[in-house]
């Protein structure tokens, strides 16, 4: 029997006794085939495991975004999607150096379909950060006060409104006339659905007294009653029925024939705006009142709140009415009411700092723990997985849950403190499974009253189940790790898989499965081997062609993809090397600084001396800290690793990085340092302002620094800047330079 238990896996998923069941991998997401790794809690992830998890989350979220925003056919529940996003964000927060260039944190929606013409949004349609607890909301208020430099007792009002589960739409009015309607798309480019939007009764065609340009944004949705009636009508006529009101609304709005949309009972709530030529009001509340005057429908549950406790009270009031509203909502959105403060707070890459979505909780379920399996990850971590009797949690059938590590099974956390009141987990137990706050299904509780007689404590292995090597647990480490290294089949192939992954060289036709097969056959052992396949096996690579599913065309396509990858961007090659602490974001930073691999390697060689200018230059790159720099230097100067890199460079010619374009502000392209106490803005606001103007903000003064902004108490940084001949200005001069005064 395999470690997957008495199940077999087919193209449609997990099968047993002739019945198809939904299989979820350790991420809790439908994958079709079992994954080889199990995942630990974010706080227990190693660097390598975190890198691998971020790659997998990126792929899963990209697929989910396309299904939801473009195809109107999501396979994940909202709770599962939110949990994926939250886990991704939590890993990035713990390992900022690993943030990928295609990070889901920087993505909004999905690329628009080719079915409709494209519309570039004048102001991006961003998503919202999520909150899942009362404490998250209090922290949200605290962050805003800290950013704005406001006292804890300073008045600060918010609006609270239901989060409608529909399709986001932007309506552009020019001289009061509706001229364009566009979906969110990927946030920057959406789909032109103007003709269809004109058929929705809640959307005015003309606005009296509106500014010359006004983009009104809101949500298209369908009521429960209208959804039921539509599905009944569709079933009678043999048409497509919809899984839920959100899918029905999205599918109805995105019809090629506007008359079909006209026949669908769509509704629209207005709640935001994009481009606007003149302000409508000074607050969010007053702006919504103006929308109502224009003829838009505003959700009647929208209220103004004076404190976080008021916000939480409204959250509970809305949640209590959720079942009787007659339309789907999945949380409550809070927005800072003062529009001038919204402007000061600004935006992160994909979300505003002044708003947050407080999501409703996911479901819990009880089921029986049938087995505990041990899986070996990329770094050798031995991770336990709970095999469960299938149970529905949050709308998805769950059959696996993470058990994190041996401490978690024994009922204690990584510090030795008891969890679950110190109750251990045993095979045969009835356990409570949940998915809130993390994509991986977890076990919240154990029902000791139902524990089978004779259930034994779980004996965690001290040797690797894959290769038999010792699996010691180092002091301070939360997990046991296989000591077999590359002789362990569960670890050896992972570096190659990372090298060809989507964020790295992304070689079409050479995915994880193919890498595993080629490795087992002895065809590839390191990245350079990929680029010598044709030379070593000849034009035909007959061994490949003889395999099922391969032929002349597919083999040639693989060779062509490999040849294309020879000139992959320098940043992708660097990321593909899988250097600890060097994620996609860090790879891009390094590539933009050094431009070529040759220049990087020369700098690394010189930076071995940590008193050298090369070391200081490396640390001066904004976003590169000592841990990251030391890992880069140590890895690339290690003899075996450098030899492997040199063999790779003999086969490829990475495309040099292109220095990023900067704007025309006075500080664009310059490196700034802030020091001392700023009196008119917080340090975070100053940094955000400088970066928005195209400047780089460093944490320390060096020869590369162009300008030091010094407030009271500047200290040693100001002294060093003066010694280096760097221009030093005060906060007032900075505000003038930044156009704030």
Swiss-Prot record:
Belongs to the NAD-dependent DNA ligase family. LigA subfamily. GO terms for cellular component: cytosol. Its EC number is 6.5.1.2. NAD(+) binds at residues 78-82, 127-128, 161, 184, 219, 335, 359. InterPro entries: BRCT_dom, BRCT_dom_sf, DisA/LigA_HHH, DNA_ligase, DNA_ligase_AS, DNA_ligase_CS, DNAligase_adenylation, DNAligase_N. The gene is ligA. SUPFAM superfamilies: BRCT domain, DNA ligase/mRNA capping enzyme, catalytic domain, Nucleic acid-binding proteins, RuvA domain 2-like. Zn(2+) binds at residues 464, 467, 482, 488. The keyword S-adenosyl-L-methionine does not apply. The keyword DNA damage applies. The active site is at 163 (n6-amp-lysine intermediate). It comes from the Bacteria. DNA ligase that catalyzes the formation of phosphodiester linkages between 5'-phosphoryl and 3'-hydroxyl groups in double-stranded DNA using NAD as a coenzyme and as the energy source for the reaction. It is essential for DNA replication and repair of damaged DNA. CDD domains: BRCT_DNA_ligase_like, LIGANc. It catalyses: NAD(+) + (deoxyribonucleotide)n-3'-hydroxyl + 5'-phospho-(deoxyribonucleotide)m = (deoxyribonucleotide)n+m + AMP + beta-nicotinamide D-nucleotide. GO terms for molecular function: DNA ligase (NAD+) activity; metal ion binding. Gene3D superfamilies: 5' to 3' exonuclease, C-terminal subdomain (1.10.150.20), 6.20.10.30, BRCT domain (3.40.50.10190), DNA ligase/mRNA capping enzyme (3.30.470.30), Helix hairpin bin (1.10.287.610), Nucleic acid-binding proteins (2.40.50.140). This is DNA ligase. Residues 662-741 form the BRCT domain. Transmembrane segments: none annotated.
């Amino acid at each position: 029997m395999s470690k997957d238990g008495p199940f077999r896996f087919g193209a449609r998923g997990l099968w047993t006794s002739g019945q198809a069941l939904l299989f979820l991998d350790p991420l809790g997401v439908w994958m079709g085939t079992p994954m080889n790794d199990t995942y630990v809690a974010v706080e227990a992830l190693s660097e390598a495991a975190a890198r691998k998890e971020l790659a997998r989350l990126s792929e899963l979220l990209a697929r989910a975004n396309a299904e939801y925003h473009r195809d109107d056919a999501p396979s994940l529940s909202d709770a599962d999607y939110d949990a994926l996003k939250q886990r991704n964000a939590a890993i990035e927060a713990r390992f900022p150096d690993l943030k990928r260039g295609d990070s889901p944190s920087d993505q909004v929606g999905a690329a628009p379909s080719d079915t409709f013409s494209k519309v570039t949004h004048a102001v991006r349609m961003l998503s919202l950060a999520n909150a899942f607890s009362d404490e998250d909301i209090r922290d949200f208020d605290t962050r805003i006060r800290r950013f704005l430099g406001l006292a804890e007792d300073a008045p600060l009002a918010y609006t609270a409104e239901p989060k409608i589960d529909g399709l986001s739409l932007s309506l552009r009015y020019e001289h009061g006339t509706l001229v364009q309607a566009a979906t969110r798309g990927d946030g920057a480019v959406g789909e032109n659905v103007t003709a269809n939007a004109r058929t929705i009764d809640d959307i005015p065609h003309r606005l009296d007294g509106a500014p010359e340009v006004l983009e009104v944004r809101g949500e298209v949705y369908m009521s429960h009653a209208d959804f039921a009636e539509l599905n009944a009508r569709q079933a009678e006529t043999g048409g497509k029925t919809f899984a839920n009101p959100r899918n029905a609304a999205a599918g109805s709005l995105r019809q090629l024939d506007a008359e079909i949309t006209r026949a669908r009972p769509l509704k629209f709530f207005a709640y935001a705006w994009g481009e606007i030529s003149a302000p409508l009001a000074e607050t969010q509340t007053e702006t919504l009142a103006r929308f109502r005057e224009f003829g838009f429908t505003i959700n009647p549950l929208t209220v103004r709140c004076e404190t976080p406790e008021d916000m939480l009270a409204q959250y509970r009031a809305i949640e209590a009415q959720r079942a009787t509203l007659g339309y789907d909502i999945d949380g409550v959105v809070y927005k800072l009411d003062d529009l001038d403060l919204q402007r000061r707070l600004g935006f992160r890459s994909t979300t505003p700092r002044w708003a947050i979505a407080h999501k409703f909780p996911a479901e819990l379920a009880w089921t029986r723990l049938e087995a505990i399996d041990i899986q070996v990850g990329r770094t050798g971590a031995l991770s336990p997985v709970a095999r469960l009797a299938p149970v529905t949690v949050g709308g998805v059938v769950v059959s696996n849950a993470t058990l994190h590590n041996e401490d978690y099974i024994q009922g204690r956390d990584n510090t030795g403190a008891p969890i679950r009141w110190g109750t251990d987990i045993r095979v045969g137990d009835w356990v409570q499974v949940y998915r809130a706050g993390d994509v991986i299904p977890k076990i919240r509780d154990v029902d000791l009253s139902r524990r089978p007689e004779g259930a034994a404590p779980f004996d965690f292995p001290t040797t690797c189940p894959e290769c038999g090597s010792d699996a010691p647990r180092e002091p301070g480490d939360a997990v046991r790790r296989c000591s077999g290294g590359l002789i362990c089949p569960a670890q050896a192939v992972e570096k190659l898989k990372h090298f060809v992954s989507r964020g790295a060289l992304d070689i079409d036709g050479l995915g994880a499965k193919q890498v595993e097969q080629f490795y087992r056959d002895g065809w590839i052992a390191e990245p350079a081997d990929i680029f010598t396949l044709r030379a070593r096996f000849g034009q035909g690579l007959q061994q490949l062609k003889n395999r099922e599913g391969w032929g002349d065309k597919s083999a040639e396509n693989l060779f062509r993809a490999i040849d294309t990858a020879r000139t992959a961007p320098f940043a992708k090659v660097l990321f593909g090397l899988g250097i600890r602490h060097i994620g996609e974001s860090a790879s891009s930073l390094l590539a933009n600084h050094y431009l070529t691999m040759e220049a990087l390697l020369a700098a690394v060689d010189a930076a071995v001396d940590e008193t050298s200018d090369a070391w200081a230059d490396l640390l001066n790159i904004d976003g590169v800290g000592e841990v990251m720099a030391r890992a880069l230097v140590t890895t690339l100067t290690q003899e075996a690793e450098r030899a492997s890199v040199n063999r790779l460079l003999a086969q490829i010619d990475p495309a040099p990085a292109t220095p990023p374009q900067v704007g025309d502000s006075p500080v664009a392209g310059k490196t700034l340092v802030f020091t001392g106490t700023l009196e008119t803005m917080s340090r975070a606001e100053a940094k955000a302002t400088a970066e928005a103007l195209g400047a780089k903000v460093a944490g320390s003064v060096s020869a590369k620094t162009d300008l030091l902004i010094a407030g009271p108490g500047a200290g040693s940084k100001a002294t060093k800047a003066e010694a280096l001949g760097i221009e030093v200005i005060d906060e007032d001069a900075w505000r003038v330079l930044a156009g704030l005064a």
